[in-house]
A protein has these predicted regions:
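Generic beta-sheet signal
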Residues: 3, 96-102
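Active-site nucleotide-sugar/metal-binding loop of Leloir-type enzymes
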Residues: 90
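Active-site-proximal alpha-helix that buttresses catalytic centers in soluble enzyme cores
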Residues: 2-85, 93, 107-108, 118-122, ...
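Extended, charge-rich low-complexity interaction segments
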Residues: 104-114
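Domain-level recognition of soluble alpha/beta enzyme cores
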Residues: 118-144, 149-153
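Residue-level signal for well-ordered alpha-helical positions
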Residues: 61-62, 113-114, 137
Length: 153
């Protein structure tokens, strides 16, 4: 099973728009990431997002390319300050490839728990629009891919 963790793309500041939709740069970055994932033949059964507009827009841009059979869905457990425990349970029970689109510090905390890293300093960074992919091998999770807008030309 592969799990793709995606931090939402760059968004407008709350001063510009309280809903904080993706900025033009954020949309471009995520569109480029989605195309790269499509070119790599990445397959996910479904994409879950936090429900915040920037997260939903990111999820939908990626889904437009990857076409997950299970669609795109909001889940209440991917917010910036949410407890990772319910999502850890969900991920551990999942058998199909899954993508989660969320925020910091949630994604970094989830990644740290999955790979059992003692310190987040040893893990890939979650800049806006970045993806970190992990794969379950036996009973352990390992990072196998890290992509972001600055890494994709």
């Amino acid at each position: 099973m592969k799990l793709y963790l995606v931090r939402h793309g760059k968004a407008l500041s709350a001063d510009q728009d309280l809903a904080q939709p993706l900025s033009v740069e954020g949309r471009d970055d995520i569109t480029r990431l989605a195309r790269t994932l499509g070119n790599m033949n990445v397959k996910v059964a479904r994409i879950l997002h936090s429900g915040k507009l920037r997260s939903e827009e990111t999820a939908r841009l990626v889904a437009a390319v990857l076409q997950p059979a299970g669609g795109v869905h909001k889940t209440g457990n991917l917010g910036p300050g949410d407890d990772i425990s319910p999502v850890l349970e969900l991920v551990r029970a999942e058998e199909e490839n899954l993508m989660l689109v969320g925020h910091l510090p949630f994604l970094a905390n989830l990644l740290q728990a999955l790979v059992e890293a003692p310190d987040q300093d040893d893990l890939p960074l979650f800049d806006t629009g970045n993806l970190v992919a992990v794969e379950k091998i036996g009973s352990r999770w390992q990072v196998f891919r890290h992509l972001g807008p600055r890494m994709i030309m």
